[in-house]
């Protein structure tokens, strides 16, 4: 939930509600995705048939890989994961990862191999030590890497971002290699594939990139590599284009749901961002089996946007408290508690949750109960933030994050994603773990909250808003806004280290659980890096076109 404007009377709110808000620009997409027409059934069937043939051909290559050819095997796994194909080969990759982890007999003087091995293992949950890089340090504090060995330099830079607290060798690797890569970039042809790789890494390290966007951007680069595998390349193109068809159908469904929601509820003041919300949530659950997760996530995000804008911008304290009371009842009879403008929305919200139960079927519909609990907690904490607003109370940073790390909807979103997964390893214990708000999800929540606040505070300070974490830090430590923002950027960076440490320590949970949280972190970083792209969504237009509009030429 964003920061709040000052408390308004019911009369003022009633005067505003029929009007569309001038605060938010209209949708950039209109009815574009509502008019989507899929390819004919034979066309799609042919694409799927060819993709299946290629998948098995690539599987044979993967099964033939051994740790005796470690550089080739590590590079193949990294390539498949970057191209968005790793999902199809989880068993084969897991087996190879275990062998790579267990086999310490490799060339520890090959900086590129050491970096790629470290990156691959840590990214996939193996807590390998970082002291393998100590032997590459020079007396001057840099890292021994020949000027011509630019690939090793880039691999080291990307590997170092999988760092934990106290790993000075990785901190030094980042600062040292960043300078060398920046210098190198100035000497490369701007349009060369390697220049694009370096530029992308300096902007966003490989570990922090949104997986589906990385696949879309990397496929054309992989196509230029002399060592490319033609079957892998063709499969990557086909797989992305097939996924794009699924994404467009899901977007059409979600857009129709949203338009009906707004038309029937008459809540014209809310942000019209259903395409951007789908793009955001897609970044967390882009693998083929997670269609229902993407749909549930997008609808939940849409509902949260409406509730947030009611609490944030248009609702009086009295109206919001009535909504909070009705919300926890989950029954149409509660509409008598609500003001007129909230009643239709409340009914439509109940219908949406019922549609989730119907889609999940009798074996998994219990998951919606946990999702409802998460949403109840969210609305309850929104009410606490309203009290802070009305009392003009400025909490400490710590106190603020105790609440706001949850009101950024971390529990609701993780439960939404888990709810839609067909994976039977997602059980009641998974939801109970998430609802307990464990430290791993709390850290993720702090990361999202701080990322949001650091880009939205300057915009919101022009209005009568209650304090964000930036303002809390300014008051608590007596700093300027610029200094507070710099400190919060440091805390955001620390959150990545915290999440990595905490994920490596997790036991007894399905592998997809921490993977999802990291994918949420990546897609959130993409939304809030340097700007609030949900509110000002022009920044996302090119990326949305790449993912949902433009197929890759085959």
From Swiss-Prot:
Coiled coil: none
Entry keyword set: Cytoplasm, Lyase, Magnesium, Manganese, Metal-binding, Plant defense
Pathway terms, separated by semicolons: Secondary metabolite biosynthesis; terpenoid biosynthesis
Induction: Up-regulated in leaf sheaths after herbivore damage.
An annotated Gene Ontology molecular function: terpene synthase activity
Residues engaged in binding Mg(2+) 2: 308, 312
Motif position, DDXXD motif: 308-312
EC number(s) on file: 4.2.3.101, 4.2.3.81, 4.2.3.55, 4.2.3.-
Protein family: Belongs to the terpene synthase family.
Listed name of the protein: 7-epi-sesquithujene synthase
Species whose genome carries this gene: Zea mays
